[in-house]
Amino acid sequence: MKTNFYFILLLLGVDLGYSQNTPTYYKDIAPIISENCMECHSYGGLGPFSLTNLEEVKSKIKTIIAVTKSGYMPPWQADPSFRSFENERFLDSTSIKRIENWYQTGMKKGKKKDLMNSNKLDRVKPKEDLTLFMNEAYVLSNKSEEDYRFFNIPTNLPEDTYIRSIEFIPGNKGVVHHSRIMVDTTNQIRGIDGLSEYDPKSLEYQKLPLADEFLYGWVPGNVPVLYPQGTGKKLFKNSDLILNIHYAPTSKSETDLSRIKLYFAKEKVDKEIKVLTIREGDIANQPFFIRANTKPTFYVSYSLKESINMVSIMPHMHFIGDSFKVLAVTPSGDAVPIIKIDKWDFNWQSTYLFKKPQYLPKDTIILITATYDNTISNPENPNIPPKDIAYGWDSTDEMMNFIIYYY
């Protein structure tokens, strides 16, 4: 009778390999990987391996389980319980457990029709209007240390131009660790091209004011900035882009020719994207100086001089940054959570995109709390034993910036 029962189940098309509650690749796992991993882990991407199909995911499943359970991947610093963002990459405990259950139940394939169309790589991507390359390829020759370089890239724009998006493309994903793009409208910083952060000449150039200190910041997986329709960021005629690249150590000669893609605003720009940078000079408990073997906290209380609609934000510190929190208090007393980073990681800085523009009225107070760890217990401390650290562009100096892109 038992044999006949199983025979009947097979005739009815029941899959005896798994139940309806058993996770499958197409229904449960592929959407998680697509939304949170494939931007880096794809062919030509920045991850060390691809996760674009079932076999690739199965081959790396133990690694995936380990790095997701530890919180190492996906790399996302902001606390989602404090504020959720459009471009967040975050796996909750349910998703992490689902991946592990899929492995434990035999990594069933499931039905392809169950696949949710969440793959960001399949979304229509417009063609760039202008691609700007470094003036010449930079050669790293057996450098066993971190390498921080400045490059000057003239835009040669014939007129003031509004851009709706900007994208950085590393020329050598094996050595380009992260980058930052700034704007100079004076054309007086062109001599910085190819100089190290530590070159005395570059220190002189750093004294000159910039039109934009943070046009865009890139780390692996950071999405291109896309401003809302009807808005645009103005790049002035003949302005230069200052590209700051961090190269990872290499054991052999490597070459990099990175590029920047600009996407012009096609429709009428009714609202210009502006940049507000709250910086070290706005700190209430001056001076901005971090003594060796201390963990100081700095505070900012910044009053908005106009009403704004925030499109995106970018906190910025260097290696001894430890935590960063921003809260806004409106004139009516409403508290608006902006961002909370409990454990800062210099290597995974991001531009955080709001799901919809966040309105803040004039006279709103932006409260910033930033803590630094200049002790030997900080594994990212560039100085062992610790040294006194002050403000500076160099990555071994420190900064405390909160950049707001708004209209």
Region locations from a protein language model:
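Short acidic/polar inter-strand loop motif in beta-rich domains
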Residues: G106-G110, A248-S253, T371-E380
